[in-house]
Amino acid sequence: MTTSSRILRTAAAAVLALCLPVGFAAAPAMAAKRAPVVYDALGDSYGSGYGVPPYLDACGRSTAAYAVQIDGRMRIELDDFAACAGATTAGLLATQLTALDATTSLVTLSIGGNDIRWGDVVGACVTQGDLACAGALQATTGVIRNVLPGRLHSTYAQVAAAAPNAHVVVTGYPRLFSPEYGSYLAASPAEQQAMNDGADLLNSVIADVAHQHGFQFVDVTRRFLDHGVNAPEPWLLGLSDPGRFHPNVDGYEAYAAAVTSSVNPRDLR
């Protein structure tokens, strides 16, 4: 276990002990006779918990991350918290695969958004004109369709090889906007919908490749409905926040709920 994992588990334990209901907190004790599920968390900023400081290190790892929140549930024991803000598929392969081995029972993986430079697209649409937004969306759509699948295939194959006994959960990305609440900065409702469509396309490609490798895909789209950056109760941070267009505390709680409700304990060895 890495030092960062130990520190995060200690910090998170105090918070979770106050928040979990008695019945839920007692569950691990009843399962004490079974071996713990060795869990390694890989990915980008959506996996590291970026957006909710304080951060443990330059990777933007936060105790708000869904990986830390699910630590201790369903016999899950967070072993290596390797997810790092800014990670691409190439970066993950270069720096995060060492977290995995034959003892790994569960892997969560959030990757792909930085490969298509999704943050740049959103930035263009909310701060520039219609032409800049349309051009950015068109360009990134081509990357999603024609470039990203190959990168994901390579990444997933190497994850599977590095953790041959693990159940791998791939998490998707939320729609960032709630167009029904009107314009957001320079982005009209129509442009917001176009970006949401782009997020849907990204998720569909990630899900398709994940399923081809026998991985489980967890879609968070429905959980974030009506909680876009321009909604009355946003679960995502807006442009003025340093963690712009990443989940807030509520958003990461939604991720944790999505993962724990989707994973069958029988799949965890």
Question: What positions do the PLM features span?
Answer:
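Catalytic His-Asp segment of secreted/periplasmic serine-dependent ester chemistry enzymes
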Residues: 174-269
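Solvent-exposed loop/turn segments at secondary-structure junctions
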Residues: 45-48, 77, 84-90, 113-118, ...
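Acidic/histidine-rich helix-loop elements
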Residues: 50-62, 122-131, 244
